[in-house]
Amino acid sequence: KIVKVKGLDEIFIGLNDLSLGKGKKFMFELLADGTVDSLVSKFREAGLPYGFGGLASLEGGLLPGKMVLKEHYRLGSTCVILSRSFCNTDKVKNLGEVEEIFKSLKSIREYEKLCERADDFEENRQKVRQAVLKIVGE
């Protein structure tokens, strides 16, 4: 229904909110169970750019950021929001420290260049699924 709203330019899937609404234990279960695939196919049909969140760091997070970022490329995502854990301002108060954290965006951009030429998206999708099942204890 949302894809028919007039004036809609882009859609962002809030994985945390959606996973809570669906009673999931972990927000990336929505990648593993095909929910995101199903949604983005509808957005593609409607010609709407889309994205989903969130990305911590390439190595950080329960599900490594590299795996999440590669899923963005597999699914044709046009945007991602950095997660709170990327730069937790409740813990990081020093501006210099914040600047250092954001310098890591360079490594994310470099990894994106690799993703643009990747041919192992299906392999990554399976790895994500297995990792998520392990995280949620199934």
List each model region and its residues.
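Expand to "…catalyze enediolate/carbanion chemistry for C-C bond making/breaking, isomerization
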Residues: 1-138
